[in-house]
Amino acid sequence: MLPIHLNLTVAFFLALAGVLIYRSHLMSTLLCLEGMMLSLFILMALMITHFQVFSVSMIPLILLVFSACEAGVGLALLVKISTTHGNDYIQNLNLLQC
C-alpha cells in the first residue's frame, strides 16, 4: 500500500470517528461527512489511475456529484432547523416530521 493510500484511508476513518463523536450538532456531522466523501473521491481516483482501469473512470465524478447533492440537502436542513429552532442540534430533526 502506498503512503498516500494509507493517508487517505486514515483520513476517511478519522472523519468517520468525527461523525460518531460529534453527532449532536448537524454542522459538525455535515463537515465530517464531506471529509469522508472527499477522501473517498481522491482514493477512488488514485486507485483507478494506479491500477489503470479506465473503464470505470466516471465513478469518482458520480460520487462527487452525489456528494454535492448531499451537501445541498444538508445545508437546506441546517437552514430550516436554525431558523425554526435557533440551534443546530440533531435531536431537532424529529420535530420536522409532518
Swiss-Prot record:
Name of the encoding gene: MT-ND4L
Provide the protein's localization.
Mitochondrion inner membrane
Supply the PANTHER family for this chain: NADH-UBIQUINONE OXIDOREDUCTASE CHAIN 4L, NADH-UBIQUINONE OXIDOREDUCTASE SUBUNIT ND4L
Subunit text:
Core subunit of respiratory chain NADH dehydrogenase (Complex I) which is composed of 45 different subunits.
Q: How does it sit in the membrane?
A: Multi-pass membrane protein
Gene3D superfamilies registered for this protein in UniProt: 1.10.287.3510
Annotated function: Core subunit of the mitochondrial membrane respiratory chain NADH dehydrogenase (Complex I) which catalyzes electron transfer from NADH through the respiratory chain, using ubiquinone as an electron acceptor. Part of the enzyme membrane arm which is embedded in the lipid bilayer and involved in proton translocation.
What name appears for this protein in its UniProt entry? NADH-ubiquinone oxidoreductase chain 4L
Q: Does the keyword Transport apply?
A: yes
Q: Provide the catalytic activity annotation.
A: a ubiquinone + NADH + 5 H(+)(in) = a ubiquinol + NAD(+) + 4 H(+)(out)
Q: Any one Gene Ontology biological process term?
A: ATP synthesis coupled electron transport
Tell me one GO molecular function of this protein: NADH dehydrogenase (ubiquinone) activity
> Any one cellular component term from GO for this entry?
respiratory chain complex I
Source species:
Phascogale tapoatafa (Common wambenger)
Keyword Translocase on this protein?
A: yes
InterPro entries found in the cross-reference section: NADH_UbQ_OxRdtase_chain4L/K, NUOK/Mnh_C1-like
For this UniProt record, give its keywords in alphabetical order, as a comma-separated list. Electron transport, Membrane, Mitochondrion, Mitochondrion inner membrane, NAD, Respiratory chain, Translocase, Transmembrane, Transmembrane helix, Transport, Ubiquinone
Transmembrane ranges, per UniProt, are 1-21, 29-49, 59-79
**EC annotation?**
7.1.1.2
Entry similarity comment: Belongs to the complex I subunit 4L family.
